[in-house]
Amino acid sequence: MPLPPPKETSTALVTGSSSGIGAAIAAELARRGHGVTLVARREDKLKALATEVADAHGVRAEVIAADLTDDTARLDLAGELERRGLTVDILVNNAGFTTMGPVHLSRRDQELAMVRTDVEAVVDLCTIFVPGMVTRHRGAVLNTASTAAFQPLPGQAGYGASKAFVLSYSRALGAELKGTGVTVTALCPGPVETGFAEASGLSDEEASESLPRFMWVPAERVAAAGVEGLEAGRPVVIPGAANRFGALAGYYAPKSLVLPLLASQHPALKKARRD
């Protein structure tokens, strides 16, 4: 099913769009003529990207700085869009982060913030914006999950479980919406060159210890695959042949074999054992 056609009063809401995959998805949608609303905490970065995509593609690019761990901020986001006269025809739930290391050494505040961003915000924004899409008989939702969704992930236990939730939720929501004119796609990238792991306390070298470089995919390629999958109405998109193979292997292989291997190779667990 084609994406909803661009309109002056419609927008593609992209969370986590100040950098990485989110910024690349916003640029890809703008390249296709869609106005975008960029949402993240860093207003300075959002403004710079908004200027860039507006100048490059001649689309309306809005900026709303918000902390999506806060449910009040999510409701305020909906109200602000209404005040600006915009309806959300494309929703991209991309905001997210990971914690790394064994659970017994984790920080409670960080673990809960991750769940609020990676899980709660996805559910809340779908609950807020999907009803309007159904009423208008047009809309598309792209939820960023991960290849970590296909098997438990020692060393990132909460993150893997969060992304498994996003994948399951997206597939169920897509089935519920069949025939309404609204589609749902789960984007499941493998490792992406975005500084994501480094922001979680690991260097790129440490993060790539357990994953060969040929599995890493540029953010722009992930974004293009995600938007193409969204336009085609695919329920799941896994960019990169190596990552598709890895996801299937992780899903079908006996967990009694997979989990000890993952635990032994995860760089955060290696680091914890050394420390």
Question: What residues fall within each predicted segment?
Answer:
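Conserved glycine-rich cofactor-binding loop
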Residues: 18-19
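Conserved glycine-rich Rossmann-like NAD(P)H-binding loop of the short-chain dehydrogenase/reductase
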Residues: 32-49
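Conserved NAD(P)H cofactor-binding loop of Rossmann-fold oxidoreductase domains
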Residues: 94-99
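Substrate-binding pocket helix/loop in short-chain dehydrogenase/reductase
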Residues: 102-115
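Active-site helix of classical SDR
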Residues: 126, 162
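Residue(s) in the substrate-gating loop at a strand-loop-helix junction
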Residues: 146
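SDR active-site lid
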Residues: 179-243, 256-259, 270
